[in-house]
Amino acid sequence: GSYWVVEHAYPSGLLGWLSIVLKRHCEVLHELTKDEWVEFGEISFNVMKALKKTLNPKKEYLSCFAETRGFEHIHFHVIPKTAAFDENLPGTHSFRYLQVSEKNAIDIAKIRELCTALKQEMSGKWR
């Protein structure tokens, strides 16, 4: 998009954990422009549909905190509740998936494969 970029979190213990990141620096939601919000809606819609087709999650979480030191920049987490999702990590507990070492993270080749599939699903859907 013009305002946002989608990337896979790494290291991550959950395949499909995506971030929708604002391209310009901003730390608070109330400073986003209407155009940025409109595009965010379009991108998040397309991301959810693409995740459904590729990973078939039963549900998705969408969150934005932007408060952890070094991560104050506006970004949204898209967390798919796939068959691999640990039901003992509901809600904000799911952030434990980001507390893994690279050694225990999802294999980068699997992430690249998923990102290629997601890109195919979403191609041509941006304004």
Task: Label each PLM-derived region with a short phrase.
Residues 1-127:
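HIT superfamily nucleotide-processing domains
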